[in-house]
């Protein structure tokens, strides 16, 4: 019918990095692109969200939009969805977890998301990592090493890579890396908070 609004959609998947989210947005011709050729710092400035790093903050889901909707509007919607899910789960978290704040839980959830895609393993892996944090043991998880390698990662991790200190190498650092390494889904958020 005339007057019906045609809806388009863009999907962000669990485990994606912010770069992958932006790549998905860039491929949608019906989106008004305000962020495409900007640095992450400039994108954050334009988004005007209360975050200092974009990684992990945009909830994985399918977002429907009409032609001319901006990438800023879609990312704001995805941020609000992550914030809502994180707030709800944080408010009902288990006692005695080693996180100082919900951002640390988001970081841990991103690690769980990259560590396994199997539903039944999330709780077990989260339990192992929580115990390691509680006793001050390094997390020792390959996905953080891979993230820290950036474009240098070519499909394999060497022993040297595991020893090379980066702020994301959980073989060489104590505790959590400084930011999430991907966008976690609700199941990973739940696993690290229960």
Features from the language model and the residues they span:
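Short, flexible domain-boundary/linker segments around small modular repeats
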Residues: 1-4, 42-45
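Short, well-structured active-site flanking segments
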Residues: 32-40
């Amino acid at each position: 019918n005339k007057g019906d609004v045609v809806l388009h959609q863009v999907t962000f998947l669990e485990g994606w990095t912010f770069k992958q989210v932006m790549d998905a947005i860039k491929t949608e011709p019906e989106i008004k692109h305000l962020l495409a050729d900007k640095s992450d710092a400039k994108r954050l400035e334009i988004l005007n969200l209360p975050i200092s790093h974009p990684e992990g903050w945009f909830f994985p889901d399918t977002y429907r939009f009409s032609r001319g909707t901006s990438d800023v509007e879609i990312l704001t919607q995805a941020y609000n969805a992550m914030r809502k899910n994180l707030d709800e789960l944080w408010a009902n978290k288990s006692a005695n977890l080693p996180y100082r704040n919900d951002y640390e839980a988001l970081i841990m959830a991103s690690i769980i998301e990259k560590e396994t895609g199997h539903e039944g393993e999330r709780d077990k892996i989260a339990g192992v990592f929580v115990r390691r944090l509680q006793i001050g043991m390094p997390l020792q998880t390959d996905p953080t090493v891979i993230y820290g390698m950036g474009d240098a990662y070519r499909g394999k991790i060497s022993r040297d890579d595991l020893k090379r200190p980066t702020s994301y190498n959980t073989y060489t650092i104590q505790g959590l890396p400084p930011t999430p390494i991907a966008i976690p889904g609700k199941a990973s958020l739940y696993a690290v908070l229960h």
